[in-house]
Structures are given as C-alpha cells and as structure tokens.
Amino acid sequence: PHLNENTHLLFSYHGLPISHVKRIDASKKHCQKVANCCEIACDANALCYGRHCSETTHAVVERLGLTDEQWSMSYQSRLGPVKWLEPATTSKVEDLVNRGIKNIVVVAPAFLADGLETLEELDIELREDFLEMGGEDLTVVKCLNDDDQWIDGLESLVRKRLDPITA
C-alpha cells in the first residue's frame, strides 16, 4: 500500500564501522579494496554484513519488480568519528531530495522490532530533516514487531530447532 510510481523505496540498514566489517575478510584483499566489494559474492565476503544487506535488498527489489531508479540503500545509526558503511541514510535522503524525489518510503530490514533506531531516528528525526530539505512525504514502514505471521514463522523455526533437542 505504500509504493506507487512517484515513490522511492529506501532500504536503511543499521550501520557498522568499517573496521568491524573488514575483520570478516580473511583475505585482507577484498573489503574496501575492491570497487563495490559488497556487491560481489566471493569467499572473502561470504560472512560480510554489507554483502548480506545488499543481497537482501536485491532480493526484495526483484520480488517487487523495481527499476534501479525506484530504490536505494543506506546505513543509519552512526556514532563517533570513525569511518562507517556508506552512504549514510541522512546523506542519501539529501541526495534524493536534490534529485527531485519528494516521496520516500523507508524500510529497515535489519530491525525485527521497532526501537529508537526506527521510531526516533527514522520516523521523527529523518522525517524532520527530509521536510526541511524540501521533501513532501516520508513513510517509515513499521517493523515486524508482533505481527501474527512473523510470530507464527518464528514459532515454527524455534520448534524445528527444539525438536532434535527434545526428541
């Protein structure tokens, strides 16, 4: 119900410092050394958070049938002076507004339940910034929280994991 031809879908993931992401690259030759390193599936980034965010985004984009112009991806919740995964959500929203995009739907796939990062950072602070930048409508999709289908699915997963233990 949130998407239409005049809406841009922004996937906002929790950010991580680059130093944390680089630790996963056992080769020490891929992460942040190869252009678009998170977009390339290889052994060096098999456990990479950025790669998993990218794969999740592309899977949803494909299922929704979106064009490249209809979506983008960013990272939020930065702290301190260290370098973090990019682009930052606020910077990405500013870029979108500067490109003439006035209607944005934000989804935060890394968050299962709403908390400060979604309720405060996205739904309040980002919305205020977006409107000040000249945007018109920003919708933040609620997290799964206690949605019946999510709880049923989680219960099913837990039961499958417990069955071998309790059998």
Task: Describe each region flagged by the PLM.
Residues 1-167:
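Extended amphipathic ligand-handling, pore-lining, and cofactor/metal-binding catalytic surfaces
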